[in-house]
Swiss-Prot record:
Gene3D superfamilies: Glutamyl-tRNA reductase, N-terminal domain, NAD(P)-binding Rossmann-like Domain
Listed name of the protein: Glutamyl-tRNA reductase
Residues given in the record as substrate binding sites: 49-52, 105, 110-112, 116
Annotated organism of origin: Shewanella sediminis (strain HAW-EB3)
Any one GO molecular-function label of the UniProt entry: NADP binding
Entry remark concerning the domains of this protein: Possesses an unusual extended V-shaped dimeric structure with each monomer consisting of three distinct domains arranged along a curved 'spinal' alpha-helix. The N-terminal catalytic domain specifically recognizes the glutamate moiety of the substrate. The second domain is the NADPH-binding domain, and the third C-terminal domain is responsible for dimerization.
InterPro entries: 4pyrrol_synth_GluRdtase (IPR000343), 4pyrrol_synth_GluRdtase_dimer (IPR015896), 4pyrrol_synth_GluRdtase_N (IPR015895), GluRdtase_CS (IPR018214), GluRdtase_dimer_dom_sf (IPR036453), GluRdtase_N_sf (IPR036343), NAD(P)-bd_dom_sf (IPR036291), Shikm_DH/Glu-tRNA_Rdtase (IPR006151)
Keyword Oxidoreductase: yes
Catalytic activity: (S)-4-amino-5-oxopentanoate + tRNA(Glu) + NADP(+) = L-glutamyl-tRNA(Glu) + NADPH + H(+)
Role, per record: Catalyzes the NADPH-dependent reduction of glutamyl-tRNA(Glu) to glutamate 1-semialdehyde (GSA).
Length: 416
């Protein structure tokens, strides 16, 4: 058997097709059992995220895996096949290591994918679709992803606006855990900002939004306080950090409002990060002595620098993934040789047992022991040398000197 992986992702298929081949969390358990039942080894792991669906098996039959996917989702071969990428053998291991390390992600080096791959592996184990090869492949992959994170800077630099905003705050304040943060807006970007802040130990967050119910829903998750936009002047003086991202056509925080808040703060510095377009914070706020205003353009230049840094780190990571996939395949080959040795020994022992049993029966019937012993030795020799003799004969007829040399070495004929 050999490793096979097929998949589609954001590079090869539209959102529409990705949705059609995705596996919902409540169905993926049974899907993995179904796919595993179609393989000779009973091994299958399915990774399904918003950006990719990938099927990993140890079947050696790529076409069968594709047929299963099409049948499961009731899709035509013409719709699915052109969007699939396929890997076999070592390429499977290398691809999985690249995916788990964020090297194949929409955002280069993003860490979330590793958690998603781990969840898929756990579900596969629960479904009983993991045996020795898949277990070793995924366990090795997790170690490689950790090695890449440790030995390269692939995940060190911020490459999203939300992450960059929080990274900037970390550079300015020695510890975010003691800061008070005002978030303006309650959309996806601000939610991501809140998550990064929470991960960095921020406990005091206020979320201001035009619709209070939307802010309250978000605050429940992060233990924050929800307020309306009209209440901002009351909470602004307590804020060390203000991060704003709304869809407002007009500025929400003006120079006068911020100036008044700074006076109440006795001119303690305030970091303001405006990641909205159009701006949420008046540009004139930057003129105030104790206000440090950054816009989305400032963050974008940081992101571009960081992306260059990640691309450089990705080159190092690619080398690690390739090296480690080679090592994994050495283990696979050693496993195959162990199986071959076991099969060869079993077959040889079966021949020996059969011939010994015949000899014992003949002895019991009064046969000549010396004659039977010689007959046993001859028959055993002939049986054991039959396969290598045939292989040497075929190689000689074909003029295959390489195979002849390998057979001579294996049979110990070239020993001095």
């Amino acid at each position: 058997m050999s490793l096979v992986a097929i998949g589609i992702n954001h590079k090869t298929a539209t959102v529409d097709l990705r949705e059609k081949v995705a596996f919902s969390p409540d169905k993926i358990h049974d899907a993995m059992k179904s796919l595993a039942s179609r393989t000779k080894t009973g091994e299958a792991v399915i990774i399904s995220t918003c950006n990719r669906t990938e099927l990993y098996t140890n079947t050696g039959d790529e076409a069968e895996v594709i047929r299963w996917l099409e049948e499961y989702h009731q899709l035509s071969h013409e719709d699915v096949e052109p969007c699939l990428y396929k890997f076999e053998g070592q390429a499977v291991a290398q691809h999985l290591m690249r995916v788990s390390s964020g090297l194949d992600s929409l955002i280069l080096g993003e860490p979330q994918i590793l958690g998603q791959v781990k969840q898929s592996f756990v579900k596969a184990k629960e479904a009983g679709s993991v045996a020795i090869t898949m277990d070793r492949l995924f366990q090795n992959t997790f170690s490689v992803a950790k090695k890449i994170r440790t030995e390269t800077e692939i995940g060190a630099a911020a490459v999203s606006v939300a992450f960059a905003a929080v990274s900037m705050a970390k550079h300015i304040f020695s510890s975010l855990s003691t800061t008070k943060v005002l978030l303006v807006g309650a959309g996806e970007t601000i939610e991501l900002v809140a998550r990064h802040l929470k991960d960095n130990g921020v406990d005091s967050m206020v979320v201001a939004n035009r619709t209070l119910s939307r802010a309250e829903g978000m605050c429940e998750e992060f233990g924050a306080t929800a307020i309306t936009l009209e209440q901002i002047p009351d909470y602004l003086p307590q804020a060390d950090i203000v991060i704003s991202s709304t869809a407002s056509p007009l500025p929400i925080l003006g120079k006068g409002m911020v100036e008044k808040a700074l006076k109440q703060r006795r001119h303690q510095p305030m970091l303001l990060v405006d990641i909205a377009v159009p701006r949420d914070i008046e540009a004139e706020v930057a003129e105030l002595d104790d206000a440090f205003l950054y816009t989305v353009d400032d963050l974008q230049s940081i992101i571009e620098q960081n992306m260059a840094s990640r691309r450089e780190a990705a080159e190092q990571a690619e080398v690690i993934a390739e090296e480690q996939s080679h090592l994994f395949m050495e283990w696979v080959r050693s496993l195959e040789s162990v199986d071959s040795i076991r099969e060869y020994r079993t077959a040889s022992m079966a021949i020996k047992d059969e011939l010994v049993e015949r000899a014992i029966n003949k002895l019991a019937q009064g046969g000549d022991s010396e004659k039977l012993l010689l007959e046993l030795a001859n028959k055993l020799t002939n049986k054991l040398i039959h396969a290598p003799t045939q292989a040497l004969t075929v190689a000689s007829r074909q003029g295959d000197l390489n195979s002849i040399g390998q057979l001579r070495t294996a049979l110990g004929l070239d020993k001095n």
